[in-house]
Protein backbone atom coordinates (compact mmCIF):
# COMPACT_ATOMS: atom_id res chain seq x y z
CA UNK A 1 0.00 0.00 0.00
CA UNK A 2 1.38 3.41 -0.97
CA UNK A 3 1.69 5.67 2.03
CA UNK A 4 1.62 9.43 1.84
CA UNK A 5 5.09 10.97 2.00
CA UNK A 6 5.99 12.91 5.13
CA UNK A 7 6.25 16.61 4.28
CA UNK A 8 8.96 17.68 6.70
CA UNK A 9 8.39 21.42 6.14
CA UNK A 10 4.92 21.03 7.71
CA UNK A 11 6.14 19.32 10.89
CA UNK A 12 7.60 20.57 14.16
CA UNK A 13 9.02 18.55 17.04
CA UNK A 14 9.33 20.10 20.49
CA UNK A 15 11.37 18.46 23.25
CA UNK A 16 12.19 19.34 26.85
CA UNK A 17 15.93 20.00 26.83
CA UNK A 18 19.16 18.64 25.41
CA UNK A 19 20.70 15.68 27.17
CA UNK A 20 23.70 16.14 29.43
CA UNK A 21 26.06 15.58 26.49
CA UNK A 22 23.71 16.96 23.81
CA UNK A 23 24.37 20.01 21.69
CA UNK A 24 21.86 22.78 22.58
CA UNK A 25 22.04 24.05 18.98
CA UNK A 26 20.89 20.70 17.55
CA UNK A 27 17.58 19.63 19.14
CA UNK A 28 16.86 15.89 18.94
CA UNK A 29 20.23 15.18 17.35
CA UNK A 30 20.99 12.29 19.70
CA UNK A 31 19.42 8.98 20.75
CA UNK A 32 15.97 10.48 21.42
CA UNK A 33 15.84 11.89 17.90
CA UNK A 34 16.96 8.56 16.49
CA UNK A 35 14.17 6.82 18.41
CA UNK A 36 11.58 9.27 17.06
CA UNK A 37 12.89 8.74 13.50
CA UNK A 38 12.70 4.95 13.93
CA UNK A 39 9.14 5.09 15.31
CA UNK A 40 8.07 7.46 12.52
CA UNK A 41 9.72 5.28 9.86
CA UNK A 42 11.57 8.28 8.55
CA UNK A 43 15.25 8.71 7.91
CA UNK A 44 17.31 10.63 10.41
CA UNK A 45 17.91 13.26 7.70
CA UNK A 46 14.14 13.68 7.31
CA UNK A 47 13.80 14.17 11.06
CA UNK A 48 16.54 16.81 11.02
CA UNK A 49 14.71 18.58 8.14
CA UNK A 50 11.68 19.15 10.43
CA UNK A 51 11.46 22.23 12.66
CA UNK A 52 12.93 21.27 16.04
CA UNK A 53 13.25 23.04 19.36
CA UNK A 54 13.92 22.36 23.01
CA UNK A 55 11.88 24.42 25.46
CA UNK A 56 14.85 24.53 27.85
CA UNK A 57 17.93 25.31 25.81
CA UNK A 58 20.43 23.77 28.25
CA UNK A 59 20.56 20.63 30.35
CA UNK A 60 19.16 21.55 33.78
CA UNK A 61 20.45 18.66 35.84
CA UNK A 62 18.65 15.80 37.55
CA UNK A 63 15.74 15.50 39.93
CA UNK A 64 14.26 12.48 41.66
CA UNK A 65 12.44 11.15 38.58
CA UNK A 66 14.25 12.23 35.43
CA UNK A 67 15.64 15.61 34.51
CA UNK A 68 14.84 19.00 36.02
CA UNK A 69 12.68 21.24 33.85
CA UNK A 70 12.26 25.02 34.03
CA UNK A 71 8.55 25.60 33.31
CA UNK A 72 8.91 29.40 33.17
CA UNK A 73 11.47 29.18 30.34
CA UNK A 74 9.41 26.44 28.74
CA UNK A 75 6.28 28.61 28.68
CA UNK A 76 8.14 31.49 27.01
CA UNK A 77 9.69 29.23 24.38
CA UNK A 78 6.34 27.51 23.72
CA UNK A 79 4.81 30.93 23.00
CA UNK A 80 7.69 31.63 20.60
CA UNK A 81 6.97 28.37 18.76
CA UNK A 82 3.31 29.32 18.36
CA UNK A 83 4.21 32.78 17.06
CA UNK A 84 7.19 31.90 14.86
CA UNK A 85 6.62 28.46 13.37
CA UNK A 86 4.54 28.08 10.23
CA UNK A 87 3.91 24.36 10.45
CA UNK A 88 0.66 22.37 10.39
CA UNK A 89 1.55 19.61 12.84
CA UNK A 90 3.56 19.77 16.06
CA UNK A 91 4.67 16.77 18.12
CA UNK A 92 5.04 17.64 21.82
CA UNK A 93 7.52 15.24 23.44
CA UNK A 94 6.45 14.64 27.02
CA UNK A 95 4.00 15.96 29.58
CA UNK A 96 6.19 18.93 30.61
CA UNK A 97 6.25 20.17 27.02
CA UNK A 98 2.48 19.65 26.64
CA UNK A 99 1.83 21.67 29.82
CA UNK A 100 3.87 24.58 28.45
CA UNK A 101 1.51 24.68 25.47
CA UNK A 102 -1.50 24.72 27.83
CA UNK A 103 -2.43 21.04 27.47
CA UNK A 104 -2.86 19.69 30.99
CA UNK A 105 -4.33 16.40 32.14
CA UNK A 106 -4.42 14.91 28.65
CA UNK A 107 -3.14 11.40 28.00
CA UNK A 108 -0.23 10.51 25.78
CA UNK A 109 -1.18 10.15 22.13
CA UNK A 110 -3.99 12.70 22.43
CA UNK A 111 -4.36 14.80 19.31
CA UNK A 112 -5.57 18.38 19.64
CA UNK A 113 -6.55 20.79 16.86
CA UNK A 114 -6.28 24.40 17.97
CA UNK A 115 -4.58 27.64 16.86
CA UNK A 116 -4.99 26.43 13.26
CA UNK A 117 -2.62 23.55 13.97
CA UNK A 118 -2.68 19.95 15.08
CA UNK A 119 -0.73 18.84 18.13
CA UNK A 120 0.17 15.31 19.22
CA UNK A 121 1.08 14.73 22.86
CA UNK A 122 3.74 12.08 22.53
CA UNK A 123 5.53 10.23 25.34
CA UNK A 124 9.02 11.49 26.09
CA UNK A 125 11.28 9.15 24.09
CA UNK A 126 13.94 8.62 26.77
CA UNK A 127 14.54 5.23 28.34
CA UNK A 128 13.62 6.66 31.75
CA UNK A 129 9.97 6.85 30.70
CA UNK A 130 8.41 3.53 31.79
CA UNK A 131 5.46 4.05 29.45
CA UNK A 132 7.63 2.53 26.72
CA UNK A 133 8.00 -0.75 28.66
CA UNK A 134 4.71 -2.12 27.30
CA UNK A 135 4.88 -3.35 23.71
CA UNK A 136 1.32 -2.33 22.91
CA UNK A 137 2.14 1.24 23.95
CA UNK A 138 5.06 1.35 21.53
CA UNK A 139 2.98 -0.20 18.74
CA UNK A 140 0.15 2.29 19.25
CA UNK A 141 2.60 5.22 19.50
CA UNK A 142 4.32 4.16 16.27
CA UNK A 143 1.02 3.87 14.38
CA UNK A 144 -0.32 7.21 15.60
CA UNK A 145 2.95 9.07 15.06
CA UNK A 146 3.22 7.81 11.48
CA UNK A 147 -0.38 8.79 10.68
CA UNK A 148 0.01 12.18 12.35
CA UNK A 149 3.24 13.02 10.51
CA UNK A 150 1.66 12.08 7.17
CA UNK A 151 -1.25 14.43 7.92
CA UNK A 152 -3.81 11.65 8.27
CA UNK A 153 -6.48 11.72 10.92
CA UNK A 154 -6.98 8.89 13.37
CA UNK A 155 -9.80 6.68 12.01
CA UNK A 156 -12.92 6.15 14.11
CA UNK A 157 -12.56 3.20 16.44
CA UNK A 158 -8.76 3.51 16.60
CA UNK A 159 -7.77 3.80 20.25
CA UNK A 160 -6.59 7.37 20.75
CA UNK A 161 -4.90 6.91 24.10
CA UNK A 162 -3.86 4.46 26.74
CA UNK A 163 -2.67 4.61 30.28
CA UNK A 164 -0.23 7.43 30.81
CA UNK A 165 0.77 6.34 34.30
CA UNK A 166 3.49 4.02 35.45
CA UNK A 167 2.58 1.04 37.61
CA UNK A 168 3.75 2.74 40.80
CA UNK A 169 1.70 5.87 40.04
CA UNK A 170 -1.39 3.83 39.24
CA UNK A 171 -1.32 1.90 42.50
CA UNK A 172 -0.63 4.94 44.67
CA UNK A 173 -2.95 7.44 43.00
CA UNK A 174 -6.23 5.75 42.13
CA UNK A 175 -8.10 9.06 42.41
CA UNK A 176 -5.80 10.73 39.90
CA UNK A 177 -6.39 7.98 37.35
CA UNK A 178 -10.14 8.46 37.74
CA UNK A 179 -9.78 12.19 37.16
CA UNK A 180 -7.87 11.50 33.94
CA UNK A 181 -10.66 9.29 32.63
CA UNK A 182 -13.16 11.99 33.49
CA UNK A 183 -11.18 14.55 31.53
CA UNK A 184 -11.09 12.32 28.48
CA UNK A 185 -14.82 11.61 28.55
CA UNK A 186 -15.66 15.30 29.01
CA UNK A 187 -13.47 16.11 26.02
CA UNK A 188 -15.21 13.54 23.85
CA UNK A 189 -18.64 14.80 24.90
CA UNK A 190 -17.74 18.39 24.04
CA UNK A 191 -16.63 17.35 20.54
CA UNK A 192 -19.89 15.58 19.80
CA UNK A 193 -22.04 18.31 21.30
CA UNK A 194 -20.56 20.88 18.89
CA UNK A 195 -22.28 19.21 16.07
PLM regions: where:
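Charged phosphate-binding loop/patch that engages nucleotide di/tri-phosphates or the phosphate backbone
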Residues: 130-175, 181-195
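A polyanion-binding, active-site-adjacent surface
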Residues: 1-110, 114-131, 135-155
Amino acid sequence: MNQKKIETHKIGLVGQAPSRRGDPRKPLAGPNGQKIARLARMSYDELIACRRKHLNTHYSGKRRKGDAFDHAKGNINAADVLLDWRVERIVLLGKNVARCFGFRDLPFLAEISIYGRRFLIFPHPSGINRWWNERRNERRARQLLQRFLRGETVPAGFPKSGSTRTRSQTSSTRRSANNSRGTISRRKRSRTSRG
